[in-house]
């Protein structure tokens, strides 16, 4: 009887939990699909946007500015 209870618990509780798709996985897949549907120019703009950096203000500048901005 104990073996049957263990088998029922595994198949009715643990197996469905292991096969559920987590909600956290959904946005990543949706983002990848939306990104695939973008034009190459839009994709390029998104990829290059984080690299763009404006000049810092002279008041904030310390000796760490290597780009000659300060």
Swiss-Prot record:
Residues 1-24 form the signal peptide. Residues 25-53 form a propeptide. It is found in: Secreted. It holds the Pfam family Conotoxin. Expressed by the venom duct. GO terms for molecular function: ion channel inhibitor activity; toxin activity. Its main location: secreted. The keyword Signal applies. The keyword Flavoprotein does not apply. GO terms for cellular component: extracellular region. Keywords: Disulfide bond, Neurotoxin, Secreted, Signal, Toxin. Disulfide bonds join 55-65, 56-69, 61-70. Belongs to the conotoxin M superfamily. The cysteine framework is III (CC-C-C-CC). This is Conotoxin VnMLKM-01. It comes from Conus ventricosus.
């Amino acid at each position: 009887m104990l073996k049957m209870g263990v088998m029922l618990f595994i198949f009715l509780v643990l197996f469905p939990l292991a096969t559920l798709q987590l909600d956290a996985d959904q946005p990543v897949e949706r983002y990848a699909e939306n990104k695939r549907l973008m034009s190459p120019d839009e994709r390029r703009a998104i990829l290059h946007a984080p690299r763009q950096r404006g000049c810092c203000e002279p008041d904030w500048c310390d000796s760490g500015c290597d780009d000659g901005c300060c």
